[in-house]
């Protein structure tokens, strides 16, 4: 690798290929993960145990040569366990700050819905502000700071569901899902002697990522596509069965993520296809459905799918 930032698309392609060495059959998930990372957001992975969520986060961190921390969320986890704490140093007769796991580049917040709302809020505020306040002192987080949170969609006993306002902090929510039987056989073969994570290293630098983020923000998007995004998000606010639609934050997130995806594809501009591909991962988790709609089987993804069919894309 050069010391100078690589071409942004080349950077993202190298990272994607490196992560896929470990996460076989998960190209679509890696694609969304990189769009969120490059777009400056955070992701919530919602899937069953054993689908590779932890491995995905570790592979991304290794590909960037980035700092990585994993934090298991439990009911007794405190905000100070995430943010850090000031401890009095008897020798120096002064308080010393001991940084918590949030001070890293890639943070895996495992089973975030198992912690209390107060503890969840401590992390989600850090995600939104890029800084934390401990004992009256504000401290900036390390850049880049990327959170990959997970939750199990099946188990609900002993969990604290994230409220809509907190879900809005995540640029995307998606489920990696199970790979095909053929890919699962290949995964078994890969792990006969050692874990594939041991065989990968850094293929890009944090400076390369910073360059990719700048390039993504500069990807052109036509005025009619901005209106298309606003129309899609706006329709969720009046959709049947929706108590609370997506906020303008969803519009901004969809634009930023679509720009990042266009960069990953090597496109010179955002297309309707980029917006449509990311609409559900960006918007669906932000919708609050009324109880009757949920009981009848309506989902946030279903609402977004209906909106995409109802709103014509610009030619």
Predicted regions: what they are:
Residues 2, 6, 236-315:
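C-terminal engagement/docking regions of AAA+ P-loop ATPases
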Residues 7-48, 230, 234:
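Pre-Walker A (pre-P-loop) alpha-helix and adjacent loop at the N terminus of AAA/AAA+ ATPase modules
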Residues 31-35, 88-108, 137:
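Conserved alpha-helical scaffold flanking the Walker A/P-loop in AAA+ ATPase domains
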Residues 37-74:
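Walker A/P-loop
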Residues 47, 110-111, 122:
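Walker B catalytic acidic pair
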Residues 48, 82, 150:
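P-loop (Walker A) phosphate-binding loop of NTP-binding proteins
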Residues 63-91:
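AAA+/P-loop NTPase substrate/partner-engagement loops
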Residues 89-94, 115, 119, 127-219, ...:
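Canonical AAA+ ATPase core
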